[in-house]
């Protein structure tokens, strides 16, 4: 990887979300909060694998339920291939079992979509090393 490519990778965030409206909402939030970042988005696990291989994003926002993959299992696969990549698993489902599975798979944290407007930007800032980690826990 060249220095230019490496810099671009460190600035890239990938959204993996099958619902088009949610994907666009996430993109809008991230572009407003982090205008210097490159925001990519895909709708399924296969596209996520390919995009990670090609672009090596610094951060992946991973939907738990994808049409062709379980987002937590996909997180584990991506973390094996790209250990330095940060992953935030997102779901409409809350519950300690989901949080524990996501963390065990290598996710940095687990975001319940009901808390998106309050928790997304701080979680992303911490994952990207822009803000210091605090004891936010998981939402």
Label each residue range with its predicted role:
Residues 41-59:
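Acidic, metal-coordinating helix/loop segments flanking the phosphotransfer/catalytic sites
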Residues 44, 70-73:
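Acidic catalytic/metal-coordinating carboxylates
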Residues 20-40:
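Two-component/phosphorelay signaling modules centered on CheY-like receiver
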Residues 22, 67, 95:
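The feature encodes the CheY-like receiver
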Residues 50, 72-83:
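Short amphipathic alpha-helix used as the core "switch/output" element in two-component signaling
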């Amino acid at each position: 990887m060249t220095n230019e490519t490496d810099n671009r990778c460190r600035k890239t965030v990938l959204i993996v979300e099958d619902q088009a409206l949610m994907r666009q909402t996430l993109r809008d939030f991230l572009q407003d909060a982090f205008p210097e970042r490159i925001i990519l988005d895909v709708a399924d696990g296969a596209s996520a694998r390919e995009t990670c291989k090609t672009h090596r994003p610094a951060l992946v926002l991973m939907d738990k339920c994808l049409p062709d993959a379980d987002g937590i299992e996909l997180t584990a696969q991506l973390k094996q291939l790209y250990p330095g990549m940060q992953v935030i698993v997102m779901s409409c489902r809350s519950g300690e079992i989901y949080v524990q599975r996501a963390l065990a798979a290598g996710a940095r944290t687990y975001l319940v979509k009901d808390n998106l407007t309050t928790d997304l930007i701080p979680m992303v800032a911490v994952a990207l090393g822009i803000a210091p980690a605090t004891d936010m826990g998981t939402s």
